[in-house]
Amino acid sequence: MIARTPRGWSGPSFVATGGGGWGLQAGAQVTDFVIVLNNDAAVQAFSRGGNMTIGVDLSAAAGPVGRTAAGAVMPIAAVYTYSRSKGLFVGVSLEGAVIGTQRQSNFNYYGGPVRADSILSGVTKAPPGAAPLRRALGP
């Protein structure tokens, strides 16, 4: 995850997702996510720890690119999620998902203990390895 700060893009903070659900599903798929935190409150809320959402999901994927339509039970969309799926999958389900910080991955990448809020606010300097990603995102 990466955040836009007043001074440009932050360094990346590593995250993991997990969850469970119930419904009728068949097939297998791999999904890549881009998570957009739309405001400072969303960045701060995520930086403090994992967040849980409960939603209804109707999905279909076939071949190299699929589409997923998901609706979360949230009053305001402070977070947008874009996804790209590969595989063969169809299903309807009620799901819960958790997105959390991978503290050990952040430790390994930054060379020591660092908090997600320090990374995403730009307080922690981005390592040189993050430069290509930050350049690709633009100013």
Question: Each PLM stretch: what is its role?
Answer:
Residues 1-139:
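Small-residue-enriched, tightly packed secondary-structure blocks
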